[in-house]
């Protein structure tokens, strides 16, 4: 670390994705990322690295006092950068930044990144993230959204727009779906079109100063924080530009300091018309609320009011044995406490609609009311079509209903999102464990056995149990080593069962999936994998690998034997993961890939 830290701002190297491609689409996303760097610069000498790089080289060149790694972003054109040699310069503290929605399907990728980079402390921009990643909430702090006061302020615009309606209005935003049409049908409105982030049409949307001036010219502007009850940037941008915020009452919004009819207006589908009629009939009330909201934002929610990362840096430098750092709330400061005092960070306990449905479905599934549980999980997808917790639970429901193929397809999709679409080194450990179990339920035990070590750094209790099943069904004595190392974090929460309870549960799953022979072997195997009971002789099971699958497996094994692991695809050697396509991309220059298409086409046929 640089010895001049006391004579200047500490130096922070921020490994930020390359967000520049958004300049040609949703330019406001690029502005958000630039504002994050500006906020960090209030306390740090910030160096931005947005390219593939060697961590050791960067640290040697810039001598940082702290490094911050952006991760978990759901790319809308942004490029995830590759960082190597992160196990060097251990004296430099490292932080992860979950720069995404709390329900994002890249959370498993975020956790994989943190593991690979050796990061154990994280910040998130969303106040609800601890509820969506409970496995890491003890070391997770909130660096909440904010505004740039140089952009969002009172421009003195004449209030010529009664209502401005801006933002997306699809399933993720049920409050807007209810309230916006009621407002649009009754009052004169400036309505912004809805364009996807990655659409070129998004470049036509108002952003920056133009957007702030439109807000400043508006009397009232409604917004909400999604089905998750989050605090989004619009909650701060609207009053920051001196317009009256009309919004949904949530725990997170109240934690930000918003008070009904004092500095904002809380409405729902039952009273929105009544309340807006009152406000438009009493312009002095609108002005009073607007002024108070403007004051709240500029005194608490600008780039100058987000010192949490800097506070962590200072506290961590003097952290003693037996001490830890906690946060007083999502917008609160960080402080040191004694571990023996058992103080914890204060997180928002909200009423996110998807969490409520997941909990309801879990209770129904526990009662074996699978159909009703499926309905709850499917309703989650109406809010977030890619929600991994809902898809994972639907896979469990499919296994309970004996539909191993459906479960397998869902689990394949989950693994694909993390290792292919996001590009993580390995998938969520629980998703991988149940992917292997789904293979077994399809009668493909040998394939599961071959794949169980494909991601060697994965370690989790559910994965250990999947390996135990493979060992017992393969009659290898049923002895499985414990966890390979520290248990990997998962975004999924599974029922708390003993090994014997879990094995009984999976034995039942095998029966439902029409695998009575496998179920019988598992039923007679020593519970818990102790290996102390008499070995069970397994019946003959037909090999489950056709010639194409054997070829895929053979090619992958050859890559390992030839020590070409740096070119080996990071996906299982199976057609459904497009293994050959990834192999060709690694081995063949772009100019020569056309000649390989016929091979890829032949090998992509359904396995026989």
Where are these regions (language model features)?
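C-terminal alpha-helical cap of glycosyltransferases
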Residues: 303-348
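A charged, aromatic-enriched C-terminal amphipathic alpha-helix characteristic of glycosyltransferases
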Residues: 284-314
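Short, contiguous hydrophobic alpha-helices characteristic of membrane insertion segments
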Residues: 244-246, 262-268, 316-324, 374
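Long, low-complexity, intrinsically disordered segments
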Residues: 580-608
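N-terminal pre-catalytic "stem/leader" segment of glycosyltransferase-like enzymes
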Residues: 1-97, 109-121, 350-358, 363-368, ...
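C-terminal "capping" alpha-helix adjacent to the active site of nucleotide-linked donor transferases
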Residues: 268-285, 453
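Nucleotide-sugar donor-binding catalytic core of glycosyltransferases
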Residues: 2-62, 69-85, 97-236, 240-241, ...
